[in-house]
Amino acid sequence: MADTVEFAKMNGLANKILVVDMRGRKDMVTPAAAIALNSNPATQFDQIMAIHDPRVGGTDAFIDILNCDGTKAQACGNGTRCVVQALSSETGKTSFTFQTVAGILNAVEHEDGMISVDMGLPRFRWSDIPLSEEFHDTSRIELQIGPIDAPILHSPAVMSMGNPHAIFWVDRDPMTFDLERFGPLLENHPMFPEKANITLAQVISDSALRTRTWERGAGLTLACGSAACASAVSAARTGRTGRKVTIDVASSPVRVPLTIDWREDNHVVMTGPAEWEWSGSVDPVTGVWARDAVERGAV
């Protein structure tokens, strides 16, 4: 294959990730390549994490993030953990600083293999999320699905974790709701001019939540790290839990919870696993790919 780059199929809590090594190149992974890769069951993904050479001093790489529909994403916590594991395997380093379009992310791999990512600061101002209407209190806005007198979902908390999130609090298992039906309607609601990630969240205890997410640009996903962060922040902000919680991602077959710590300095730190599956080469323009005959174990 001519003009190819190395990539790895990985996952973070079953959130399907392609880590593509674009270092040493000036071009980007194209939307056409993303759509082509997602059309093949072997390379189907939620996000592409494209690793580029650093653009600013003090960082290890610039990360360009694409959704499976070819659109750009501002943040992907599960994908960031995958990048950390891939680069740690390659370099032996355990601490990294990345630049994304949403800002700077710091991450560290621990001795037990778990990876912590500082996802930055949550933003609550309506214009920062953004919303199409002004709300002074974004911990509960006027928005619902279903009949006016008996809504199925209503009054979400909204915020930005580098990307827009709406958290609907529910009193039963999030898996019992038809999110595949409601997700697209809410993602594309006029309230969200840049669309939004839609999460159903249930309080299990004062230190545990259960969530399920319809991801902007990706659809019904097995896991979404930034949505877990938004859920944890919303829970603490509204007095449902403390500032450090575990998140049981209801749709993920990986039964390892995420730990989210909304620290006193306002930074949100997510800790969880990442898993390497296999490696290959791909044309970043067309999406034509081939699997390696011998696994590399690093990008």
From Swiss-Prot:
PROSITE patterns: DAP_EPIMERASE. Pathway: Amino-acid biosynthesis; L-lysine biosynthesis via DAP pathway; DL-2,6-diaminopimelate from LL-2,6-diaminopimelate: step 1/1. Substrate binds at N15, Q47, N67, G77, N78, N163, N197, E215, R216, G225, S226. The keyword Cytoplasm applies. Keywords: Amino-acid biosynthesis, Cytoplasm, Isomerase, Lysine biosynthesis. It is found in: Cytoplasm. The record marks H165, E215 as: Could be important to modulate the pK values of the two catalytic cysteine residues. PANTHER family: DIAMINOPIMELATE EPIMERASE (PTHR31689:SF0), DIAMINOPIMELATE EPIMERASE, CHLOROPLASTIC (PTHR31689). HAMAP family: DAP_epimerase. This is Diaminopimelate epimerase. It comes from Agrobacterium fabrum (strain C58 / ATCC 33970) (Agrobacterium tumefaciens (strain C58)). The gene is dapF.
